[in-house]
């Protein structure tokens, strides 16, 4: 695989969001997945702070996603990185939540704003009572600890109805759309009045 340079990706996302804002679209947070190495990069905070200054970009419109595994493997280093990014105003999300053995107490001590529920919890949830109870428990824990919860990988009406019936309001997946190029995204939000 060919990895894109993460600093370039961050800058491109910032400039694309600013372009949409200049075209009259409401600017929404843009989320970028970071690998373990990228998240723990000691230069990341300075680069991001520099981009915020260069483009006069609101920090709350940038979100970084990383997996909970990073925190279970390198808790102190990951917590320091999370605190640094959080101090800039960046939102942090734990992606694929439920794939590792992260301690909920440790998660509440991090500067994490959002958990993204792994697709495995969503798949076949309409017919699996065990999954429904696990998801309901995670949802209630997130509410208790004031964490935003996103169900990722929602593809069908049945999955959507069961997830939203539990109370989860933020959904990601092919239920809405497959990934889109910026020009197609503009058409999509225009057609759907988003």
Predicted features and spans:
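Conserved functional hotspot residues or short segments at active or partner-binding sites
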Residues: 81
């Amino acid at each position: 695989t060919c990895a894109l340079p993460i600093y370039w990706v961050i800058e491109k996302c910032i400039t694309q969001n600013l372009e949409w804002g200049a075209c009259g679209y409401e600017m929404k947070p843009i989320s970028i997945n970071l690998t373990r190495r990228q998240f723990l990069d000691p230069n990341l905070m300075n680069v991001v702070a520099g981009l915020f200054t260069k483009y006069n970009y609101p920090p709350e419109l940038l979100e970084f996603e990383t997996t909970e595994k990073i925190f279970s493997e390198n808790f102190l280093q990951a917590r320091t990185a999370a605190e640094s990014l959080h101090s800039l105003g960046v939102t942090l999300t734990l992606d694929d939540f439920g794939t590792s053995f992260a301690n909920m107490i440790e998660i509440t001590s991090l500067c994490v704003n959002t958990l993204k529920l792994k697709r495995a919890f969503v798949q076949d949830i309409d017919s699996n009572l065990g999954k429904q109870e696990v998801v309901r428990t995670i949802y209630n824990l997130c509410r208790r600890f004031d964490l935003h919860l996103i169900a990722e990988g929602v593809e069908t009406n049945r999955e959507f109805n069961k997830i939203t019936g539990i109370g989860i309001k933020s959904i990601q997946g092919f239920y809405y759309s497959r990934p889109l190029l910026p020009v197609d995204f503009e058409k999509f939000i225009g057609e759907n009045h988003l």
